[in-house]
């Protein structure tokens, strides 16, 4: 089994808010991240797939196809977007880095053909990242 990781970057803004909590509870729980005007991050996304080497191509996965899938499913949808308002997954889900990794997994996993999605890693900044391995990995 081989593991191959492709990296991409995108910028997005968001804020943390739980509509089931009072304004005071939201401010206490989320602090300055509860500002409805949002704040932004330059995210780094690492997508790792796993599989065997194709004897014909010598690849685990078609790198061009993986790049195009990441671009179509993630970057086109999330780059320079206000996640809370412009990305459907976050209409009812708080756009934490944890939830962002899950949403990206859910977008990418069904699109994988020759290799299986193994891990989604999302860096919010240089010293904070989340790894998600999916429900069945």
Describe each model-derived feature in a short phrase:
Residues 1-137:
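Charge-rich, low-complexity N-terminal segments
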